UniProtKB/Swiss-Prot annotation:
Induction: Expression is repressed by DasR in the absence of GlcN6P. One of its GO terms (cellular component) is cytoplasm. It catalyses: alpha-D-glucosamine 6-phosphate + H2O = beta-D-fructose 6-phosphate + NH4(+). Its EC number is 3.5.99.6. It comes from the Bacteria. It comes from Streptomyces coelicolor (strain ATCC BAA-471 / A3(2) / M145). Catalyzes the reversible isomerization-deamination of glucosamine 6-phosphate (GlcN6P) to form fructose 6-phosphate (Fru6P) and ammonium ion. InterPro entries: Glc/Gal-6P_isomerase, Glucosamine6P_isomerase, Glucosamine6P_isomerase_CS, NagB/RpiA_transferase-like. One of its GO terms (molecular function) is glucosamine-6-phosphate deaminase activity. This is Glucosamine-6-phosphate deaminase. The keyword Hydrolase applies. The active site is at 67 (proton acceptor), 136 (for ring-opening step), 138 (proton acceptor), 143 (for ring-opening step). GO terms for biological process: carbohydrate metabolic process; glucosamine catabolic process; N-acetylglucosamine catabolic process; N-acetylneuraminate catabolic process.
Length: 261
């Protein structure tokens, strides 16, 4: 696991966007796994700027979804499919034909989960998976004590998560679905490169537990310690609880430029 400490969220976004751009230059049809939420927005904004400037071509790029609400129509403005269309696909000039995600409205949700897991493998696998992290260490909707070998499956949202997400539904918690489909931790770990971005002091404890703590289901993101190519990008605030922060700064500062992240 590599830990990169950057000054702020904008710098983190630019660093990860450049890693995605380098990947697309090597492999134009790369499958990028993307996450929703406010944390990854600087990544998408920086990558979109590269597309507009002609620094990278996304004509053949493909996008894979991390999770989706169950029972929310795909055309609903707050379905994650709609959110990703607005925040990722349209700014990057990628057609919906190049997008893959689970069917949250399927009559047989379990079959839909299994079908998406199979589709990810059949597509050749995710080349780079971008993740955020919750204050409790969750990745995707894999909450604490999720199996570290879990596959794409249905999960029940905690009441706190529904309260937190109500702001996207006009403040009405009754509109927030109770269930989601999420890639499992085992599924996430199959990506060739996993990049986790964390910003803000509120994520400091989770980052420290994930990077320097034991690999344990109580902190789902700690499973990234087992991945052969995992990169954790954090701003100074999110890095504030890391005991090895100076070591991480030193090693990255002296890393050969050609290695990237």
């Amino acid at each position: 696991m590599e830990v990169v400490i950057v000054p702020d969220a904008k710098a983190g976004g630019e660093l990860i966007a450049e890693a995605m751009a380098q990947l697309l230059r090597r492999k134009p049809d790369a499958l990028l796994g993307v996450a929703t939420g406010s944390t990854p927005l600087p990544v998408y904004e920086a990558l979109a700027a590269k597309v507009r400037s002609g620094a990278v071509d996304t004509a053949q790029a493909r996008i894979a979804q991390l999770d989706e609400y169950v029972g929310l129509p795909a055309e609903h403005p707050e379905s994650y499919r709609s959110v990703l269309r607005r925040e990722v696909l349209e700014p990057l000039g990628i057609d919906m034909d190049a997008f893959m995600g689970p069917d949250g409205t399927a009559a047989d949700v379990q079959a839909a989960c299994e079908a998406y897991d199979t589709a990810l493998g059949g597509s050749g696998g995710v080349d780079l998976q971008l993740l955020g992290i919750g204050t409790d260490g969750h990745i995707g909707f894999n909450e604490p004590c999720s199996s570290l070998a879990s596959r794409t499956r249905i999960k029940t949202l905690t009441e706190q998560t529904r309260i937190d997400n109500a702001r996207f539904f006009d403040g009405d918690i009754e509109q927030v679905p109770h269930h989601v489909i999420t890639q499992g931790i085992g599924t996430i770990l199959e990506a060739r490169h996993v990049v986790l971005l964390a910003t803000g002091e509120g994520k400091a404890d989770a980052v420290a537990a994930s990077v320097e703590g034991p690999v344990a289901a109580v902190c789902p993101a700690s499973a990234l310690q087992l991945h052969p190519h995992a990169t954790v990008v954090v701003d100074e605030a999110a890095a504030s609880k890391l005991k090895l922060a100076d070591y991480f700064r030193h090693t990255y500062a002296h890393k050969p430029d050609w290695q990237g992240i």
